[in-house]
Design a protein with these regions (language model features):
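A phosphate-binding catalytic loop at a beta-strand-loop-alpha-helix junction
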Residues: 90-109, 113
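Generic N-terminal initiation segments characterized by hydrophobic and/or small/turn-forming residues
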Residues: 12, 109, 151-154
Length: 161
């Protein structure tokens, strides 16, 4: 999978998607270090030295790039709700994970759904604005198409069996 060609991309006004590394025009891999560019940073993966600045609101909820349990799906729902509310309030929001494709794509797409988009449109928008490689985790796409509420209930049922 190719590295992103930008540290972050604006998906809709005020809502940005990124990762922890990107490849510049010369092909050199560079770290993404967030300073004070955003009012809120949501990290689904963290590494020391990648920011954001201590003055920036920073929410961390590390989730795997694979099947999620009910509590993790609930975290995605809450983070997306917070991101949508922040965008509506005029704040700039960055959602990031390791590569800036799957976990951040899941939260960004759910944020778009919270902002009134249909799931297929949200998925398409993420891929168009970040990369065709975004949301290549088909399970995350299935969660979005089914609805995270349904995915949460089904994941919760699996823990009972």
């Amino acid at each position: 999978m190719p590295e992103p060609h930008a540290p972050w991309n604006e998906v809709v006004p005020g809502l940005w998607m990124g990762g922890h590394h990107w490849t510049d025009a010369s092909g050199e891999r560079r770290p993404v270090i967030v300073g004070t560019e955003f009012g809120l940073v949501i990290s689904l993966y963290t590494r020391p030295g990648h920011g954001p600045d201590p003055s920036v609101d920073h929410l961390v909820a590390e989730i795997p790039d694979g099947p999620l349990v009910a509590a993790q799906i609930h975290s995605v729902q809450q983070l997306a709700h917070t991101a949508a509310r922040s965008v509506k309030e005029g704040r700039t929001v960055l959602v990031r994970c390791n590569a800036g494709y799957n976990r951040s794509g899941l939260v960004i797409a759910q944020t778009l759904i919270e902002l009134g988009h249909e799931a297929p449109t949200a998925i398409h928008t993420v891929r168009q604005r970040r990369s065709p490689s975004a949301l290549n985790n088909r399970l995350f796409e299935e969660y979005l198409n089914a609805g995270l509420g349904v995915a949460h209930l089904l994941a919760d049922l699996e823990t009972l069996s």
